[in-house]
Amino acid sequence: MSFARIFRTSALMGGAQVVVLAAAFIRAKVIALTLGAAGVGLIGFFNAFSGNISSFAGWGLGTSGVRVIAGAAEADRHAKIAAVRRLGWRLSALGLAAGLLLFWPVTWATFSSSLYATEMGIAALAVPCVIASSAWSAILQASGKISSLAKVQIFGALTGLLVGLPAIYIWGTIGIALSIFFAAVVPAFVLWRAARAACPSVCGVQVEQADIRYLVQLGGALMVVGWLGQLSSLLVRGAIVTQEGLAGAGYYQAAYAISGSLPGFVFAAMGADFFPRVAAAKDEADARGITETQIQAGLLLGAPLVMALLALGKLSLHLLYDSSFDAALPLLNWMAWGVFIRLMTWPLGFWLLARGATGTVILLESIGALIGAMLPIFLISHFGLISAAIAFTISSAVYGVAVAVVFRVRSAGWFGRELHVSAFALAGILAAGQWWAAGQLNEYAGCVPVALVAVACTWAYRLQVRQAASRCTDL
């Protein structure tokens, strides 16, 4: 997998991700200005609730569907797509039932009253839409329709924003829940239309029950993985609400959203193009080479953005939320380092999902989710809100070490020395840039290290492309 292809995919998915994230931050900005940090905390909790149910009822279809379709022979691909569609409808119905059954007890368990029960019920209606979207996205992704997927994401984000903003302004907290529903239902409908247009010939294909059973078996493991992650997020937010209040949850949500947003297009590109490619790799050596190239490209793409998080964090909080969100800055700084670690570990995580044994996937993800939930819950009661961000970085590092060990054993090889040197050098540069920016009085001074890192990464990318072209010429 060439650097050029990775960067083209990143440009497509990155452009879409920028629009999606801009829409999300505009919505968060409106909530912060109208309802304050408590409103931001509420939208974070509502999203965690609907995401937790979606992860459980979705049964890992968004990932298992890609793996099954991408790895199938061309003659069998239509049958696999038909199976993903059929299972997607069934799981969407299951998700709707689960959301409607659970929103009331979860409301009481969290808020000790039914004050936000209506809002939670509306947020539950987003669950089947999210599950359906995962099925249609899997079809487009595995079929290589990256540009179609990007266009759909842009249209869905803009439409959901235009419909959701008036609801927030008019109905307050109920409008927040409605905006979550609109942000889910619009993309689901558009993705459904795009999937039908991209693969019209599967409409009359008979669904094989063996394919359904395999998707259920594989998806069961992936569901456990996704659900553990969502449950971990929900438990952490619940602990923050209990011990630090809704305002504390709002600061955590602001830092979490910003830290995951700027490098988000790198992760989106990994899921859109890298995952189906590593799933279809002919052997472990080929998969290892694809993974190493992805990590190198991810570091070059993501390093300037992590530098922006570290050097321009305060400015980001003021622009995207409000000047009253300065309490989120220490959390953002810690989370930025967790994101840097994930630039290297996420490709390994995708490799594990694509090629790892089911039991290994469940074991490693369970360990990661357990640490990600228990560590912040324990630390918050002793060291306050910032410990939740510290725990985020620690859990990212622990998970990375664990999956790296599995990768080394299963692939019977390791990455080249160049990758290790590049990673440590980038970490040192980022730390120096953060230290320099912290000593400046002007909020915009952080643009200097960001620009320098961006220039260095651009030069490194051009060097990698020239070296790849030279190797091809020699062959």
Question: How would you name each of these model-derived features?
Answer:
Residues 1-6, 180, 191-233, 273-289, ...:
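Interhelical loop/hinge segments that connect adjacent transmembrane helices in multipass membrane
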Residues 22, 121, 368, 417-470, ...:
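Transmembrane alpha-helical segments of multi-pass transport proteins
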